[in-house]
């Protein structure tokens, strides 16, 4: 499962102090420089992405005009020492272009943002981005004859329009990913236009691109939401874990350097600073390739690729390198005789970063949240042992207990895969449906179905892997699914239990949701017979439509009585299945449902006490 779609990202530049830090708190030099220039980059494409993501409802013509106007400013010589293409604050210039005339802000509901200045204006525009606005129609279907003709007449215009269509539908998607996908699209158009069956060629090729877009967009939303909710400290811990697993042979100083810059790049990406993120990502990738001898043997082929976009994609998806030889299996007595509680806040953070590095490079196949749970447990252990009479003995005993975090996740993975093998994907989804309707009955039926479909699909993917990969796969997918449930909660609060799980601790989100049982604050709606009356149309549908109808019934039932026991549920489902079988075999199907249905509803209400 992809965790970080790219180390290189978006394109606005230099929002006030974004380039001022070239060393971290421990004096480690940054790989990045402070050049605010845009020479050699696809500024038209980047500016199109920015305006389409910031003003999602704008037409292509409106976006193109804003691009033209702002590039005139950027590419004009300033008269200072900076050459054309250099601008100290490109973010401000781009936002000013949107706000320059009243027509665009008023037309698209951005007047409030334009009434603000500086970072407040920037934050307002970011808050207006919507993942799936109802005002934007579905992605236009590619019609081979028209598309091939348009591409041949003006290739640059055709591709830039494609960039616009992607960006407005995916407002948090990193610009380099959009440019990379547009580059893939640019390659398949001439190929498919010459194909014997152009329609089939386009359908096949575009499907894979669409899948990549969807996954990347969801991932970028997740990353930015985690950074926004839990702050830079948590995000740096995530990055330490991931980079240490990717490059376990690298020393701690090298990891610190990469973590500092990668975290900075993601921060700029999530702000929408496209040019800086794009250029900084290229610099980081170039640096990684220049240091491959000390970082990883797995990236040699990646570093031979012709473009930075291809190179970056390859490095991110490369296998983690092998652990160094002679590395002890455990991180025992990490602090030696030092008293953790006597350390300064800075030294505590540094010590925990080093522990996370050492633990991650020894456990390159564990999911990031599991390692962070171990690190959190280790810090709690150190704090507790500092108060004991024999800190060293306390620490030795406590380190064995850290395995419980791995064992809990292993037990869950084993149990989930056991259910998948026993039930199959559809019935596994039904089990998740019951559980999550109890945890979050405020979610709509489509939301519950979509959520649990992803969970069941994760079982289908992860449970077919080798046992040593199932755990990381399952935890990784669960982290993303729960992350998007938390984004939904942020937009429209669900209930106190969900809020507690989403906000208290990033690393503990999945265990928190696993421990939720029933939302005790939920008050079921008055019972409605209409939700439980069946008609003969149920006898005429098959496959997915029939499964969906049954799942809707299941959701309605649990929402009516969230405390329903497994035995009660099995009885009610069996009774209604019997009704379906009886009436669908009857010559008078509708009459059967009309006569038998109400009696069964009464029986069910009495049994459940609703």
Swiss-Prot record:
Subcellular compartments: Secreted
GO molecular function: metal ion binding
Disulfide bonds listed in the record: 99-114, 113-124, 148-193, 192-201, 224-270, 269-277, 289-303, 302-314, 385-394, 417-463, 462-473, 486-502, 501-512, 539-584, 583-592
Endpoints of the signal sequence: 1-18
GO terms for cellular component: cytoplasm; extracellular space
A Pfam family of this chain: Serum_albumin
Record-linked CDD domains: ALBUMIN
Changes after translation: Sulfated.
Glycosylation sites: 197, 251
Tissue: Plasma.
Positions contributing to Cu(2+) binding: 22
Gene3D superfamilies referenced in this protein's UniProt entry, alphabetically: 1.10.246.10
InterPro entries referenced in this protein's UniProt entry, alphabetically: ALB/AFP/VDB, Serum_albumin-like, Serum_albumin/AFP/Afamin, Serum_albumin_CS, Serum_albumin_N
Modified residues (Phosphoserine): 111, 115, 345, 445
Highest rank taxon of the organism: Eukaryota
Example GO biological process: apoptotic process
Entry annotated with the keyword Oxidoreductase: no
Family recorded in the similarity comment: Belongs to the ALB/AFP/VDB family.
PANTHER family: ALPHA-FETOPROTEIN, SERUM ALBUMIN-RELATED
Function field: Binds copper, nickel, and fatty acids as well as, and bilirubin less well than, serum albumin.
Subunit and partners: Dimeric and trimeric forms have been found in addition to the monomeric form.
Name of the protein: Alpha-fetoprotein
Highest classification ranks of the organism: Eukaryota, Metazoa, Chordata, Craniata, Vertebrata
């Amino acid at each position: 499962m992809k965790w970080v779609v790219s180390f290189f990202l978006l394109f606005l530049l230099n929002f006030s102090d974004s380039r001022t830090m070239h060393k971290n708190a421990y004096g480690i030099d940054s790989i990045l420089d402070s050049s605010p220039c845009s020479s050699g980059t696809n500024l038209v494409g980047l500016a199109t992405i920015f305006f389409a993501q910031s003003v999602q409802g704008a037409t292509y013509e409106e976006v193109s005009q804003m691009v033209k106007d702002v590039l005139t400013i950027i590419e004009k010589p300033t008269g200072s020492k900076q050459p054309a293409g250099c601008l100290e604050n490109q973010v401000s210039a781009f936002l000013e272009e949107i706000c320059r005339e009243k027509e665009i802000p008023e037309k698209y509901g951005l007047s409030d943002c334009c009434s603000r200045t500086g970072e407040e204006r920037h934050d307002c525009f970011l808050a207006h981005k919507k993942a799936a606005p109802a005002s934007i129609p579905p992605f236009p279907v590619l019609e081979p004859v028209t598309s091939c003709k348009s591409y041949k007449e003006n290739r640059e215009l055709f591709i830039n329009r494609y960039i616009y269509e992607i960006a407005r539908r995916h407002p948090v998607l990193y610009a380099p990913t959009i440019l990379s996908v547009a580059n893939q699209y640019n390659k398949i158009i001439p190929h498919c236009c010459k194909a014997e069956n152009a329609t089939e060629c386009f359908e096949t090729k575009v499907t894979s691109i669409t899948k990549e877009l969807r996954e990347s967009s969801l991932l970028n939303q997740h990353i930015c939401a985690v950074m926004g909710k839990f702050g830079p400290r948590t995000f740096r811990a995530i990055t330490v874990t991931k980079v240490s697993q990717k490059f376990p042979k690298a020393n701690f100083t090298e990891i610190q350097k990469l973590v500092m810059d990668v975290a900075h790049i993601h921060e700029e990406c999530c702000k929408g600073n496209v040019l800086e993120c794009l250029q900084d990502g290229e610099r980081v990738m170039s640096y990684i390739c220049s240091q491959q001898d000390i970082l990883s043997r797995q990236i040699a082929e990646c570093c031979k690729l012709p473009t930075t976009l291809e190179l970056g994609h390859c490095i991110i998806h490369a296998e983690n390198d092998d652990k160094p030889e002679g590395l002890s299996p455990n991180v025992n007595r990490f602090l030696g005789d030092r008293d953790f509680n006597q350390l300064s806040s800075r030294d505590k953070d540094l010590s925990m970063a080093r522990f996370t590095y050492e633990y991650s490079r020894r456990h390159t196949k564990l999911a990031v949240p599991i390692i962070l749970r171990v690190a959190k447990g280790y810090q709690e252990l150190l704090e507790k042992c500092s108060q004991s009479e024999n800190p060293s003995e306390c620490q030795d005993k406590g380190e064995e207990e850290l395995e419980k975090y791995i064992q809990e996740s292993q037990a869950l993975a084993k149990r989930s895969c056991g259910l998948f093998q026993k039930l199959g994907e559809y019935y596994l989804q039904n089990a998740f449906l019951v559980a999550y309707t109890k945890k979050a009955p405020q979610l709509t039926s489509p939301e519950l179905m979509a959520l649990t479909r992803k969970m069941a699909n994760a079982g289908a993917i992860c449970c077919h892997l080798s046992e040593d990969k199932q755990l990381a796969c399952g935890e990784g997918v669960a982290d993303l699914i729960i992350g998007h449930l938390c984004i939904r909660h942020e937009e429209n609060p669900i209930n106190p239990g969900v809020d507690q799980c989403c906000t208290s601790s990033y690393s503990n989100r999945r265990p928190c949701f696993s421990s939720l049982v029933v939302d005790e604050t939920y008050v079921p709606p008055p019972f409605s017979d209409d939700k439980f009356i069946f008609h003969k149309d149920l006898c005429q549908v098959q496959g997915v439509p029939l499964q969906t109808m049954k799942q809707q019934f299941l959701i309605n039932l649990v929402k009516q009585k969230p405390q329903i026991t497994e035995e009660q549920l099995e009885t009610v489902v069996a009774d209604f299945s019997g009704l379906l079988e009886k009436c669908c075999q009857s010559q008078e199907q509708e009459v059967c449902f009309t006569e038998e249905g109400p009696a069964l509803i009464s029986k069910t209400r009495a049994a459940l006490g609703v």
